Amino acid sequence: MERWTVRTCVRTSVALLGTAVLSIVPSFQRSASAQDTLPVGYGTLKRDDIVVRFATDQLEIQVLPLAEQVIRLLAPDTYRSLAQLLKTKGRDLADAAQRTGVDRPTLVMVTFFGLLPQARFSPEDVNITSRGRLFRPVGIVPLSPRWSSYQLDAHEQAVAIYLFEEGISFHEGLTVSYQGLANDAWTGVLPTLDRERARVMARASLQPRP
């Protein structure tokens, strides 16, 4: 009984955090999340399960969707970390969205890893094609001090949150491209998301109602 109580408290805390985050981050994030009925705190996926990654001769690029319907499928500690990040950067994201005139941008985390010394990267060259439409970043909120240098040493990384116009669907196949390279690995992620979504709903349904 004690173990069940602890587990329930943890899930309750994560759920409360999700509610708190939605009340603090900009309205575009609240609006998108409010439409998602997927409960918080029942996911088990790891970040590596949903990251799209590919490499050039100098860089490895990782693309992580930050849509609520995706990150709610992650393990509670991982969701909590990303939710806290969105909360911390909420004002910067709101300002970036306002500058571009996009009310509800799609948020994506992009990471560049240096594979060689003095590896150069071009942030604006990361694009997403969804439903036959090419989306280019309309705003970028850097998370790493070295972002503006556009250059990395070997094993060094630069991370940022990208803002794209609304319209990218993470429920369907899509393609991430960078300087002539294209990766459609997200199509292979979809079955994993579908299975985990069903499991999350099943786990949540087994919990006693308050």
PLM regions and their residue ranges:
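N-terminal secretory signal peptides that target proteins for export/translocation
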Residues: 1-9
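A residue-level detector for conformationally permissive "hinge/kink" positions
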Residues: 10-12, 26, 124
